Amino acid sequence: MGNQFSESLTRYQLTVFEDDWGALQRGIEKESLRVKSDGHISRSPHPKALGSALTNPYITTDFSEALLELITPVSQTIDGCLQELDNIHRYTLQNIEDEEILWATSMPCPLSADT
């Protein structure tokens, strides 16, 4: 962990607010593009194993079939959110085409074969 980040964590840990912070509920939405091994955006339809993009509360699409949104249920802990995201992400990876990967961002970036 970076020194500045550690200092910030220490600085803002105010015991007066601990009960309030514990009552927070949180969720994560993570976008990823399905990308083929050649670095181009996948043109294949939304994988059936991921359920309907319109009704699955955890895996949906954004502006295109290839842009997945992974959505965690609400959790009271950061660890709970991250574990749910990990579970959804792993399930998604197991159920997309073999030659597809999940691009880490929603910005499309075709890659050349030399990359």
Annotate each PLM feature.
Residues 1-115:
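Terminal catalytic/cofactor-binding subdomain
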